[in-house]
Each structure stands twice: as C-alpha cells, then as structure tokens.
Amino acid sequence: MKLSQVSALAACVPAATARFVELMEADHVVLRPDEPTFLIETAPGKTQWVTEEQKWELRRDGQRFMDITATKDLGSQGLRIKESVEFPKKCVNQDEVKSLAKNLDTAPMKANLEKLSSFHTRYYNSEWGLKSSDWVLEKVNEMIKEAGADKTVTAQSFPHTWKQHSVIATIPGQTNSTIVIGAHQDSINLWLPILAAPGADDDGSGTVTIMEVFRALLKSKDVVQGKAINTIEFHWYSAEEGGLLGSQAIFQQYEKQQRDVKAMLQQDMTGYVKGTLDAGLPESVGVIVDFVHAGLTKFIKTVIEQYCAIPWVETKCGYACSDHASASKAGYPSAFVIESSFDKSDPNIHTTSDLIEHLSFDHMLQHAHMTLGFVYELGFHNFAKAVEGDGEL
C-alpha cells in the first residue's frame, strides 16, 4: 500500500473557510491507488480518505461519519444563523392534533413494515435498494390518492448517482417556509452489503412511523387545502448508512436554492424498548441533545409532554449519527428523536437479526403522536409574526 499524494489532491480542493471543510494532509490514510476512495468527515473539519470497505469497518467499530466526497461545499452558503428562528413556547393546536391523532393506527405501520423489511436488503447501491425506494414512492402516492389530495399534495423521487432514490412528499402551505419530517429508508448489513439486511428498526421503523403521520395528516382538510402557514415536507432518505449521502444531496440543493427550512425532525429507530424495560426504567423516547438545535429540541420536549403518554429522556449520539446532521450543516435548525436513551437502543441493527419481532408498535405509535403534534404545531406557526414580537410563542 502506498501513501496518497495528498499535496496533489489539496490543489483540487477549495480553500477552507469557517464553513468549509479543511482537508489536512495528516487526516489522510494509506490507500491502494487502484481502489475508489471517499472523503469522510468524522467530526467537524476532521476528514480522511477511505475505501468503501474501510467505511464499513469504521461503522462496525461504531464510528459515524458524513461522506462528503460530493458535498464538500455543504454549508458554504452561510445560511447558518443568518436569522434567528423562534419556536413556540407552548402547543396551541391541541383540539386539531388530538382529532387527527385518532386516525393513527398500528395496523398500517405493521403492514408497511412487514413489506419494507421483506426486501433482501435496502442497500442503497443495489437493485433491492432501488426496488424498495420504488415501493416507498408508490406507497406514499397511494396515500395521497386515497386521501383525495392529489390535486395539491405531491410525491416525487429525488434521484442520486447510486441506484436507490430518495422520496419527497410536499404539502404546499401559504408560504415557502418549510417544515421537514425525515427518516432514512435504506438498510445495511455491515458485514457485507450484499447480505440480508431486513432493517426493521433501522430505519424501517422510522420510515413507516412518518408514513403513518403523513397518512393521518392528510385527513385534515385545512392541511390538504393549503391553509397551513408553512409548507410541509416528508423526506425518506436514501443512503444514510453510507454516510448521510441522500440527505446531504437534498440539503445541498436546498441550500443552493436558498430554501427557507424552518425546522427538520429526524425519526431514526422508533420501535425498540426492550433495553429500557430490561434495565428497570420506564418506557420513554430519547431526545438527542448533541449536535442539534437547542431551541427546536426544547420545543420537541414540549410537544412530547403535550401529546405523548410517555416521558422523554435526554441522550447523545455523537457527530453525524443520522440525517438531521445534513440539515444542520446546511444551516437549518434540526433535531432527532430516537426510541430510547442511546445506550439502550436496539443492539440488532445492521445484522440479519434486525427483525419486526423485536419491536413494539405501541412505542412506534408514541413517536407518531409526537411527530404529528410537531408537524401540525409548526405547520400552522407564524414564524414571521413571532420574530416581529406580535405573536404568542
């Protein structure tokens, strides 16, 4: 193995700024020149070149990262803190949310997860990954048609340079200010990508949780008719397991288009409670508190207290632990809620044992209640009025 010629590479990379990733020679690893290599970021500004095999080795060792090979300029537009975003101090749409919440049901989640986890794998660069993303798009469009919302609500694929596409559903509001609900649709077997990867919890559970919220939200005539103040989007990301590839591509485009994303909530792993219960602890949802937007995270706690039957616990997951990190890097307020405290989360992920039998659909339903409350409250929140000081926060 030979050392990469980092000085030659450096000449091809834009000069670093406070928002650009700085490529340091000391960060480069030993490479075989005949192998494709990828630039990953394991911490803010800390990068190294790796092969795909080395990516999976790092993941097996518990190292999370962003693959920034094609997204080195993510965050370069200077959107971060360009303007202060104020979030509500309390929930004000209880009647509407609780009425819509009656439509939330574990049966559709179970049926959808059975289908999603039946694909041999949802590895993003496989034919199975393509087929599973086709199914996600088909299912979302089916929900739109069943709700009679196809004149206003749309769903489309977001293509990538790999096989699996992301899916974006859009519910137009009165303004272009946007609330994003996200989950990643891909799965991975970290021992070898071609091996079976049912991915029931990671992140089949999040995928079907936000599907169910989307289905329930379309029961609102006000939402379907575009009466929400803000536009609402549901994202099902491709290639999260490869280094947040799909979400980075989307938020890179949004950043370049100067899209006004007011809030992004990620749901990644929503179904496993055994670790919590076995530890003698009460069932709860885990609110991530590192590498997230503090104000948005505080609001999420308020939403959980208002709309969930179980409490929240604070927990940490490290840098780039899910797709909210892509939104955050682009300068958008983002947050992440997981099934439990991080140390009590599902030990079966990334293996053939990530199966439905280990999951609680009642727990997933709590995540759905939280997500529905979150998206409805913020969908109808007047951010402009709040900034002016005329609205109640």
Swiss-Prot record:
One of its GO terms (molecular function) is metal ion binding. Its cofactor is Zn(2+). Glycans are attached at N176. It is an enzyme of class 3 (hydrolase). One of its GO terms (biological process) is proteolysis. Zn(2+) 2 binds at D202, E241, H350. GO terms for cellular component: extracellular region. Residues 1-18 form the signal peptide. Coiled coil: none annotated. The keyword NAD does not apply. Binds 2 Zn(2+) ions per subunit. Disulfide bonds join C317-C321. It is found in: Secreted. Residues 19-84 form a propeptide. InterPro entries: EF_Hand_1_Ca_BS, M28_fam, Peptidase_M28. Its EC number is 3.4.11.-. Keywords: Aminopeptidase, Disulfide bond, Glycoprotein, Hydrolase, Metal-binding, Protease, Secreted, Signal, Zinc, Zymogen. Zn(2+) 1 binds at H184, D202, D268. Monomer. Belongs to the peptidase M28 family. M28E subfamily. Extracellular aminopeptidase that allows assimilation of proteinaceous substrates. PANTHER family: AMINOPEPTIDASE YDR415C-RELATED (PTHR12147:SF56), METALLOPEPTIDASE M28 FAMILY MEMBER (PTHR12147). This is Leucine aminopeptidase 1. It comes from Metarhizium robertsii (strain ARSEF 23 / ATCC MYA-3075). The gene is LAP1.
